[in-house]
């Protein structure tokens, strides 16, 4: 296969989000997970500064919601089929925060497929969640594949979260490895050699999403005391990189 080559990256330099790479999603309808935040494009919630993308969660009444945050995607701008996708991220702290670095295919969910490279919940601070969602096994059915390794102090520093999404790795099947700081901690192989998008849709273009949700089906109970601390409730992203053979 040779070596991985960098094919796309965003280092979040400068003072604004690169519109060639990213869309800013706006809204507060719960996003299918009973989430409690409203995503805005305001600088209070989303900015690029000091070499980082900064998503800040605020407790405030806004558009019939009590929290604001931000969500960005590369939909219809940058998408990829196979490769190594990584982001260097410092997670927010606090009960109910639900940061995520993930990918979606095009079309309707769950048929399009979903790759959750990193999800974290402040109510379980040492846990990172990796997951896949397909038409036959997804979060709505409660039967999707997932793995939740424990990493002490994962919230305290920047870490590199990633996947290696490999075509025909073994036995003619695709495989997706999930990594933290370059270490493979979990993997899921295509169930069989049959191309069936219902149980393995991961052979088409996927786009990247970065967001911080609040509460909802995974985030859990909100602890408003986190908003009274000196440290803001925010996720920092130093860079996002995609490598391919």
Residue ranges and their predicted role:
Residues 1-245:
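GH16 jelly-roll
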